[in-house]
């Protein structure tokens, strides 16, 4: 093999290795930033990793909201109809946040409490994120909730 071909071969090998390394790094970064959606039942069953970041979806349980006096820290429970999970949040809650409404919170579990970094409330009375609607719909079917109460996830 002459020297020019050998240099080209090394260049091609270096480019292939650099491309593979870049692809691996991008895939690892994306995997770390992905936050899967779980319901309280799935979290308590252990489906979400013990220290992983994930989204918690469900309804804010009526009568569960408490705010610490003189602080932004709020405590509430999210339910999917089967289980409830306590949530702690120390930032300003969305204007549409209220008990009995759908919510999606992003955060991690710490000592049996979901510590939220971000909380999203549904934005009108008929819409619910599709992932939450699907999971809540299966809970409704399990508990024989009438179809009208389970029709969420689409605009009318």
UniProtKB/Swiss-Prot annotation:
It is found in: Cell inner membrane. GO terms for biological process: cytochrome complex assembly. The chain crosses the membrane at residues 9-29. GO terms for cellular component: plasma membrane. Its main location: membrane. Residues 136-156 are annotated as: Disordered. One of its GO terms (molecular function) is heme binding. Keywords: Cell inner membrane, Cell membrane, Cytochrome c-type biogenesis, Heme, Iron, Membrane, Metal-binding, Signal-anchor, Transmembrane, Transmembrane helix. Heme binds at residues 123, 127. Residues 30-156 are periplasmic. SUPFAM superfamilies: Heme chaperone CcmE. Residues 1-8 are cytoplasmic. It is a single-pass type II membrane protein. It comes from the Bacteria. The keyword Lipoprotein does not apply. Heme chaperone required for the biogenesis of c-type cytochromes. Transiently binds heme delivered by CcmC and transfers the heme to apo-cytochromes in a process facilitated by CcmF and CcmH. Belongs to the CcmE/CycJ family. This is Cytochrome c-type biogenesis protein CcmE 2. It comes from Xanthomonas axonopodis pv. citri (strain 306). The gene is ccmE2.
């Amino acid at each position: 093999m002459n020297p020019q071909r050998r240099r080209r071969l090394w260049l091609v090998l270096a480019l292939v290795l650099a491309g593979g390394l870049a692809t691996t790094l991008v895939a690892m970064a994306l995997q770390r930033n992905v936050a899967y959606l779980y319901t309280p039942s799935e979290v308590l069953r252990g489906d979400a990793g013990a220290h992983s970041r994930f989204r918690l979806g469900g309804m804010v349980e009526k009568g569960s909201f408490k705010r610490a006096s003189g602080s932004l820290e709020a405590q509430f429970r999210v339910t999917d109809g089967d289980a409830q999970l306590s949530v702690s949040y120390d930032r300003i809650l969305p204007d549409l946040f209220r008990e009995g409404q759908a919510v999606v919170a992003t955060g991690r579990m710490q000592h049996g409490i979901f510590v939220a970094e971000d909380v999203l409330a549904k934005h009108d009375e008929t819409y619910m994120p599709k992932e939450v609607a699907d999971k809540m719909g299966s809970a409704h079917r399990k508990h024989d909730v009438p179809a009208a109460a389970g029709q969420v996830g689409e605009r009318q």
